[in-house]
Amino acid sequence: MGNDDFQGVIGRTTSESEPWWPDPVLPPESTPNLVVILLDDTGFGHLGCYGGLVDTPNFDRLAARGLRYNNFHTTALCSPTRACLLTGRNHHSVGMRALANFDTGYPNMRGRISHSAGTLAEILHGEGFATFAVGKWHLTPMREASAAGPFTDWPLQRGFDRFYGFMQGETDQFHPELSEDNRPTPVPRTPAEGYHVSEDLLDQAIGMVRTQESLVPERPFFLYLAFGATHAPHQAPDDYLAKWRGRFDEGWDVCRQQVYERQLEMGVIPPGTELAPRNPGVRPWDDLSDDEQRVACRLQEAFAAMLDHTDAQVGRLLDALEDLGISEDTLVMALSDNGASREGFETGITDTFRFFNGIPQPLDEMVERIDDIGTWRSNTNYPRGWAQVGNSPGRWYKSHTHSGGVRDPLIVSWPSGIDSSVNGQVRSQFHHVIDLAPTILEILGIDAPERVKGVEQQPVEGTSLAYTFGADAVDAAEVPTRKAAQYFEMQGNRAIWADGWKAVSMHEHDPLHAFEGGLNEDNWELFHLDSDFSECHDLAASEPERLGRMIDLFWSEAERYGVLPIMDRTGNLFAGHGTPGTPAHRDRFTYHPPVPRMPPEAAPPLGSRNWVMCFEVDRPRGDEAGVLLAFGTFNNGLVVYVDPEGHLVYDHNAFTTHTVLRSEDSVPTGRSILEVQQQRVRRGPGRAWLLVDGVPAAEADIPLIPTMISPVGMDLGRNPTGISTAYEAPFAFTGTLSLVTIRTTRSFHPDEEAAFEVEAAFLTD
C-alpha cells in the first residue's frame, strides 16, 4: 500500500533493492517572492504618490521603484474585492456579491469563495510556495469565525500555511479580535503598553518571512498583508495624532483643490482632467459652524495619523526585505479595496456603528469628546467631505460604481523583473482587480489548474497586466489595454466599461436606505473615460444608441458572470438567512466557561432581540467579583459584572451613554443564579431588570438600544476591552462561573434584514 508512485526497486532485502526519492516541489531558483499589500477604504487620492496630502514615504518609495496605475479598478466593497484579488474571477462568479457576513440564498452571495474558484494561495502552495496571510480576512461567513469553526473557509483551508489577523470586516485597532491559524488568540498587549494592531501585524509578517528565509530559503513565499487601515475606526498612536494637529484647518474644499493640483502636477491624472463637482450632501466648508469645522478637522487628523502610521509599518516590511537581501527579487503589489467611505455621515461620528444603526451623532456630543478622537476611547469615521477629498478627482464613494467607489491606487514594484528605466512612471491601461492573479500566474509561468483539491475549476476571468511592465506601455494609445469589457455591480449600483466608454447607474445613495423604485426606474449616465477621466460630462442624451448598446452589454455580462438576481430592496447589505446550526437560527444558548471570545455573528444577537441571561456562579468567600459577560468595547457595548462590594451590575453602554442597573443588596455568599432581562421596542428604547435567585433586584428604562452593537464580540468571565470605566480591564471574575444560558425571542425572518427584525414581547419563561 502507498507504493503506486514508487519508481525504485523493492526486493526481499535492501541489497536487492534500489531506493528512490521523489523530487521536492520547488519553483525554479529565479522565482520571485510575492507580497500583496492591501489597504482598506483608501481612496485614489489619499497616498502621497497619488497626490494625497498625507505623508506616505514608503508607498512613495515603492512607486519610485516601480509603476503606478491610474486606471485600475475594484468592486467598490471589501469582501468582493478580496475575492477577486485572490481568485482572478469576478466576485459574483465566486459567490461574494457583497459582504462575507451573509448568505442570501443565491449562488452569487454565499458569503464564501466557491471552492471551484481556487485561490492564489492554493495554486502557489501546490507549486512549492510558502504562503502567509496576515491581517484582515473577511472571506468567511462570520458565523463560522468562532473557535468552533467550521474552518472550511478559513485562510489555512484556502491555501495559506499561516494566518495571523482578524476575520471580521473591521476591528478596533487597539482591541482587535485576533486569530492565529485556526484558533482565536489573545491580544498580546494593552493600549497602555503601546499596542496597535498594525504594528502587531507587521511583527508577525516580518517574523514569518524571516523564519522562512532562515530555515527553508529554497521556497519562495507569498505574503498577503491586508491592513485594517484605513477602514474606520480611525485610530492611531498619540504621537501620530499630535503630528497632524492643525494640518487640515483650511477645510475640505481647499484640500481637495490641492490634491487635484498635485495629481495634475505628478501626472497621475491626464492633462485637462476636471475636478468633479461637489457630491450632494457635502456642504461648502465655509458654511460649517466653528464647532463643525473643529470636529471635522480632528476627524481628518485621525485618518491622516492612521494612514501615516500604516505607511510606517509598510516601511518596516520593506526594510526587512532589504535586510534579508531579497528586496530585488520580490514582486510587491500595493492597492486599496475600494474608494473612501461615506459612512461617517455629513458631520462625522465618534463611533462607526452609529452608521450601521442609522443614528447620527449630535454635534455637542462630538465637541465634548473631541480629545478622544483617534484614541482607543473613540471609534471614529470622518465626514463625507473628507471622503470626497480622498476620492479626488472623482465622484461619489465606497459602494458606488462611479469612479469614487471603484477607481483605486495600484503600485507594482519588482526591481529584478521590471526595467529600472520605467521606475516612477504611470500606466493608464484600464484594468480591474481580477487581473492581478492572472498577472502573477503569467509572471511565474504557471497555468491555472483545471482542478484544485479535486474540485473542477471555473475559468479565470481576468486579463494579465504584465504587458504594461514594458517601456512602450507608457503610452496607452500605443499599447492599449487588453481588456474588452468589465462590469460593476454593488447594491444595485451598476456600471459597464468597454472600449474607453463607461455607462453607470446609481440605485442607492445610502446602503442602509436604498431607492425604493425598481432598477428600471434608475437613470443611466454615459462617460467617455478616455477624454473624461473624472466622469464629469454625461453624454447619455447625445449618445442614446451607444448608451443602449452599453446597457445591453451590462445585462449580457451580468448573466454571463452570475450577477443575477440583483438585490434591489432596502437593507440588502445585511440580508441573510438563519442557517441551521447558527445563532440566527437559535433562540437558546448554553455556554460552559471558559469559552474563547465569540465574534458578533457567532454570538447571540443581543442588540436586535429581547433576551434573558442566567449566570450560575459560586462565591464561597463572598468577596469574589468580576465580569460575567461582556459584548463590545468602551465605545459601545454591554457588560454584566459583580462589583467589589458584591452587587450585581448591568451596564448598557450606547455610544458611551451608560444606563447602569445595580442590585440594592449584595449577591449572597455561595452559589447563586444571577439574571438579567432586557426587552426593546423595534429600533427604539427598552427596559432592563436584574434578578438574584429569582428575586427582582433592580430595573430601569434604557433610552437607546443599538441593533448592531460592535465589531468586537462577546466574552465570558472577563472584559479585555473595558466597556465600563467602573473597573480596570479585564476584571476577570474571581469566583466560579459554571454555566451561562441566554434565551432570546425569535426575530429573524428569511429574506429580510436579520439585524433589524425584533419582537417586543418580554421573555418570561
Label for each model-derived stretch:
Residues S413-P415, L529, T741-S747:
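Short beta-strand-to-coil "C-cap" segments at the C-terminal boundary of structured domains/repeats
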